[in-house]
Amino acid sequence: MTIHIYNTLTRQKEEFMPLEENKVKMYVCGPTVYNYIHIGNARPPMVFDTVRRYLEYKGYDVQYVSNFTDVDDKLIKAANELGEDVPTIADRFVEAYFEDVTALGCKHATVHPRVTENMDIIIEFIQELVNKGYAYESEGDVYFKTKEFEGYGKLSHQPIADLRHGARIEVGEKKQDPLDFALWKAAKEGEIFWESPWGKGRPGWHIECSAMARKYLGDTIDIHAGGQDLAFPHHENEIAQSEALTGKTFARYWMHNGYININNEKMSKSLGNFILVHDIIKQYDPQLIRFFMLSVHYRHPINFSEDLLQSTNNGLERIKTAYGNLKHRMESSTDLTDHNEKWLAEMEKFQVAFEEAMDDDFNTANAITELYNVANHANQYLLEEHTSKVVIEAYVKQLETLFSILGLELAQEELLDEEIEALIQKRIEARQNRDFALSDQIRDDLKGRNIILEDTAQGTRWKRG
C-alpha cells in the first residue's frame, strides 16, 4: 500500500515519494515561547507526531525538526510587562511546552533548534539574499524584494496583484513594496539585539524557519507542516526566501491542519475562549485529549466542547475495557486451536483497513473506527465458552500496536475505592430498574479493570483480581 498526502501546494492528494529511499526529512513550525500553549497550538504537534509515528511504522527513518522562536515582538513585550529578560521567559516556556506536549504523547523531535542558537546562519542566509539581489537594506532593516521572486503566491494560490492590493506599509516601515517583508529588524532602544552587517537588530519571523530547515535538512525537504494559519504569509514567505536563495524546490509536500472551535465558535484570545493545555490536562486525561483530536481528520476543523469530550471518553473507555477483559482472560485461556484461523483472519482485515485509512492522507478518524471494530470483535470472541491464548494474545498485540501508532497508551489508571463503590451503587440502581444490560456492562467494565464482583444475600462484595 502506498501513502498519499494532500499537498496544499497542488491542492490534491499525491503519492508520497521521498527524495531518498526509506528516509523522510520533515520540518514542523514550532511555537513562539512567550506563554503557555493553548489547545489550538497543541494540534500541530499531535497531528504531525502521529504522521511521524506512522511513517516510522512503515519503515521510514524520519528526521523530524521542529523549532522554537525564542526572540520575537511577543517575547519582547512579555519581558517588558513582567520585568524579566527575554531568555528567562523563553527558557521557562520551552520547558512548559515540553511538559505539555509530552503529556499529550508527543515524542521529542530529532532536533529542536532555537533561533537564538542559530543567529550566525540566519544572518548568513540574509546576506546571501542581499548579494543575489533578492533583498535590500533600508535604515537598518532588511526586506525581501517580493517582486523579484516569480513564484510568489503559489502556495496560497493567490495572484500577486491581489496580494499587493490587500497589503499595506505600516507606520515606521521603510520598504519599497507593500508585499516586501522583513528579514532583519533594526533594534529599538532597550531591545535585545545581535550585531549584523546592517547594524544591531534581530531576525524577522519567516527567515528563521528557512535558515534552520536548510541547516538541519538541506536545500529540499520532503514534508513541511504546520497550522492552517501559517500557510500565508509565513509558509509563502519561506518558499520565496529559500527558493530564491537555492534555486531548488524548498518542500515537496505541504501539510496544514485545521482550526479548533470552542463550542462552535472560533477559538481566539480576543474572544477569551481559548483553553490552555496545562489547564485542560489537569481536568482530563491527556490521552483522552489526544484521542479526541485524532478522532477528526487533521485537515478538518474540530469543535471542542465538554459534551463531545465526554462522548469520546465513553468510546475510549469501551476500547480500554475490551483490552482489560482480554488481559484478564489470558490466564484462563488454553492452547485451543479450533477456529483460531477464523478470528485471526478477521483481525488481519482490521489491520489492513487501519493502514488503508492512514495511507489515505493519515485519516486518523477512519483509523480509530477500526480500533472500535477490533474491540467489538474481541468482545464477541470473549463470549465464546473456550478461548485460545493465541487469539487473545493476537488481539492484545493488535490493540497495543495500533494505539502506539497513534501515540496512545492502553493502560488504565487503577480505580479508587470510592470510584468502585460508586459504580457498584449505579449497578444496584440499574438492577432495581430492571436495566440488566447496564448492570451487566458495569460488571464487565469492572472486570476489565481487574475488579471482581460477588453478589451475596448481604449485598455486593468486591475484590481486586
Swiss-Prot record:
One of its GO terms (biological process) is cysteinyl-tRNA aminoacylation. One of its GO terms (molecular function) is zinc ion binding. Its EC number is 6.1.1.16. The gene is cysS. HAMAP family: Cys_tRNA_synth. It holds the Pfam family DALR_2. PANTHER family: CYSTEINE--TRNA LIGASE, CYTOPLASMIC (PTHR10890:SF3), CYSTEINYL-TRNA SYNTHETASE (PTHR10890). ATP binds at residue 269. This is Cysteine--tRNA ligase. The keyword Protein biosynthesis applies. It is found in: Cytoplasm. It is an enzyme of class 6 (ligase). Monomer. The modification Phosphoserine is found at residue 270. CDD domains: CysRS_core. A motif ('HIGH' region) lies at residues 31-41. It comes from the Bacteria. InterPro entries: Cys-tRNA-ligase, Cys-tRNA-synt_Ia_DALR, Cys-tRNA/MSH_ligase, Rossmann-like_a/b/a_fold, tRNA-synt_1_cat_dom, tRNAsynth_Ia_anticodon-bd. Its cofactor is Zn(2+). A motif ('KMSKS' region) lies at residues 266-270. Keywords: Aminoacyl-tRNA synthetase, ATP-binding, Cytoplasm, Ligase, Metal-binding, Nucleotide-binding, Phosphoprotein, Protein biosynthesis, Zinc. Belongs to the class-I aminoacyl-tRNA synthetase family. Binds 1 zinc ion per subunit.
